[in-house]
């Protein structure tokens, strides 16, 4: 008979419903994007934070709330820091969404309990919610799939080179322009301190935003203007669809306006800056975008390296121009064999030349 292992309750957190309700507007704005995301309880074991991760194409969305935990359970049995991650949508084919329940209406208490077997990481999660009618409750138990490793936030460890705060009107204008050029895949984003402008470039098309340059973010007190805290001129390339989505996610009326941060290593981050300075100090909403190479340029360079002699030059040579065909390189021979339409064209030209040569008459004068 196989040995059985007893499941032990290891750790639990209780949330502040009032804090969750304050963030309902933000959650409703991003809920479609975080449905398939990951929830993470992280930070100090005695006062962890709630974070939601999700993939946005070639970007990573992060929604974090501090000071949202009202109590913890079995804190003395845990290490100093905790980090447990689980999927937002419960596995098993059901439609239970943890975020939908946590940010729901009339929630009186909300707790998450994590358990495991001896010597193993967290394997099970139990959610319990009680509502204000003092009658209704929700209980849900699920497994935590192994190997869920959310994106490690190492971006904040690097220095910020420049910041640009956009007004809602400018952000909407840039979104529309990016959607019109989404077929080009990548967009170049550059900020220039001398000209005090933000420049977005897609091939031959350019969009320029004039900035009010300031020395500190605290001076960006008018959300209807475009501000810039530019320490260095910097440029990077990102995915055009991801940038458009990031601007829309970080633009929440009355709450956030989008702010573009330029980090070292060509990392771009779009975050939500509070409309009222000093508010939402325990909340962060950001989308991290990484440098995307220009695929068209890379493909052209690869083709140039592979074909040192242009294949088209081998195919367009006219046999009438030369009496003796030169020896072709291996690249040209391969190209002419693979491109079958060129062979009938060559035979047709030779046939026309033969016909012309037959019509030539040589006159002989015996008197000379």
From Swiss-Prot:
It comes from the Viruses. InterPro entries: DNA_pol_proc_fac_herpes (IPR007013). Residues 325-339 have a biased composition (Polar residues). Pfam families: Herpes_DNAp_acc (PF04929). Residues 318-343 are annotated as: Disordered. This is Gene 59 protein. The lineage of its organism: Viruses, Duplodnaviria, Heunggongvirae, Peploviricota, Herviviricetes. The gene is 59.
């Amino acid at each position: 008979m196989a040995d059985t292992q007893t499941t032990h309750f290891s750790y639990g957190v209780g949330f502040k419903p009032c804090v969750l309700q304050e963030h309902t507007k933000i959650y409703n704005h991003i809920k479609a994007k975080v449905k398939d995301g990951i929830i993470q309880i992280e930070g100090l074991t005695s006062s962890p934070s709630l974070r939601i991760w999700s993939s946005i194409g070639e970007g990573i969305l992060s929604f974090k709330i501090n000071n949202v935990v009202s109590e913890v359970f079995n804190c003395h049995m845990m290490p100093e820091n905790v980090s447990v991650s689980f999927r937002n949508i419960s596995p098993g084919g059901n439609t239970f969404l943890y975020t939908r329940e946590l940010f729901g209406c009339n929630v009186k208490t909300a707790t998450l309990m994590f358990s495991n077997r001896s010597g193993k990481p967290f394997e099970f999660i139990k959610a319990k919610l009680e509502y204000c009618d003092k009658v209704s409750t929700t209980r849900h138990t699920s497994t935590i799939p192994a190997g869920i490793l959310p994106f490690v936030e190492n971006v904040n460890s690097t220095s910020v080179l420049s910041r640009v705060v956009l007004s809602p009107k400018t952000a909407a204008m840039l979104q529309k322009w990016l959607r019109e050029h989404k077929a080009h895949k990548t967009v170049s984003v550059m900020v220039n301190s001398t000209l005090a402008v933000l420049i977005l470039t897609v091939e031959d098309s350019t969009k320029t935003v004039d900035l009010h340059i300031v020395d500190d973010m605290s001076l960006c007190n008018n959300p209807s203007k475009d501000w810039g805290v530019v320490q260095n001129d910097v440029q990077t390339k990102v995915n055009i669809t991801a940038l458009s989505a990031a601007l829309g996610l970080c633009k929440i009326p009355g709450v956030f306006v989008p702010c573009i941060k330029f980090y070292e290593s060509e990392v771009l981050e779009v975050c939500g800056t509070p409309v009222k300075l000093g508010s939402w100090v325990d909340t962060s909403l950001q989308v991290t975008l990484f440098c995307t190479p220009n695929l068209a340029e890379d493909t052209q360079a690869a083709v140039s390296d592979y074909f040192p002699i242009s294949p088209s030059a081998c195919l367009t040579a006219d046999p009438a121009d030369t009496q003796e065909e030169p020896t072709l390189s291996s690249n040209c021979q391969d190209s002419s064999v693979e491109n079958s339409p060129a062979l009938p064209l060559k035979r047709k030209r030779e046939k026309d030349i033969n016909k012309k040569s037959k019509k030539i008459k040589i006159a002989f004068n015996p008197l000379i």
